[in-house]
């Protein structure tokens, strides 16, 4: 499923049917919202042109979520606004007993396993 916002930013969602308990679903929803919001605010340098992709896969009650954009990548010295949002993401990942990895490769890529 791909949604296009302002005719310039496309969000593609690729997932199987997944079923989460509320203690996991709420943090995952907040994590996705925060990371997509960060992409909208910081990844595209104000030109509002880009792609955001969200992939959630499941195998044997384990989940892997990848959120990536094709923006400028994560800055070496992030602003306080960015770090506050990512700190929230880190806390929520710990809350669901997950692991978070981030890297820059043609944009930002966040891998979350839980």
Where are each of the predicted segments found?
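Glycine-rich nucleotide-binding loop
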Residues: 51, 73, 105-111
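Short beta-strand/loop element within the Bergerat-fold HATPase_c
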Residues: 49-61
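Glycine-rich ATP-binding loops of the HATPase_c
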Residues: 96-107
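Glycine-rich/acidic phosphate-handling loop/turn and adjacent ATP-lid/helix
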Residues: 62-86
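Short beta-to-alpha transition helix within the HATPase_c
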Residues: 1-3, 7, 57
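Conserved short strand/loop->alpha-helix "switch" segment adjacent to the catalytic nucleotide/phosphoryl-transfer site
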Residues: 5-36, 40-50, 80
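Hydrophobic/aromatic residues in the conserved F-box-adjacent beta-strands of the Bergerat ATP-binding
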Residues: 11, 54, 65-67
């Amino acid at each position: 499923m791909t949604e296009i916002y302002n005719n310039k930013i496309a969000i593609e969602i690729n997932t199987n049917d997944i079923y989460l308990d509320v203690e996991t679903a709420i943090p995952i929803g907040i994590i996705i919202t925060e990371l997509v919001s960060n992409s909208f605010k910081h990844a595209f340098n104000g030109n509002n042109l880009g792609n955001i992709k969200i992939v959630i896969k499941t195998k044997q009650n384990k989940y892997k979520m990848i959120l990536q954009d094709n923006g400028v990548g994560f800055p070496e010295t992030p602003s306080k606004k960015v770090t506050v949002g990512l700190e929230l993401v880190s806390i929520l990942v710990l809350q669901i007993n997950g692991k978070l990895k981030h890297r820059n490769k043609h944009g930002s890529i966040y891998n979350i396993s839980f």
